């Protein structure tokens, strides 16, 4: 969904069994951004999202699947996902993208490596394995076990009452219950 002169420059292809969405429009500096470009994807299951963009990703409904891997590389938008998972892998590798997660997850593996926000305080997870190498803070909700590693100035804030908490601190950041 986009303006009539824009829609033709939005390309969708499948490469190596992956859906790739590209905006090939030029002269973007003269465009009117009052009407955003929206791409709607309806699929029964998804197992990986590779994000390298300036746009936003939002799940309109709860995404229910066994496992999901989300990798953000060089993006600067906002990712909002409502999830029902057994295993979740969430990696904020580069850029300033913000990741906001909600729902339920059995085991969550998370890594923040750059300036973006990793906010999973609304994702109720049984076990969380998280590493923060960022200057930004991370937020998680954990019920059973937390394994947290700090490698920079960013903190890891957790809510819930995990029975087992393991921390490795190699930087000025802290692991803080809130």
Predicted feature residues:
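Extended, compositionally simple hydrophobic/Ser/Thr-rich segments
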Residues: 39-40, 46-178
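Short linear S-[DN]-x-LW-Φ motif typified by the pepsin-like aspartic protease active-site region
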Residues: 1-32, 36-50, 58-62, 178
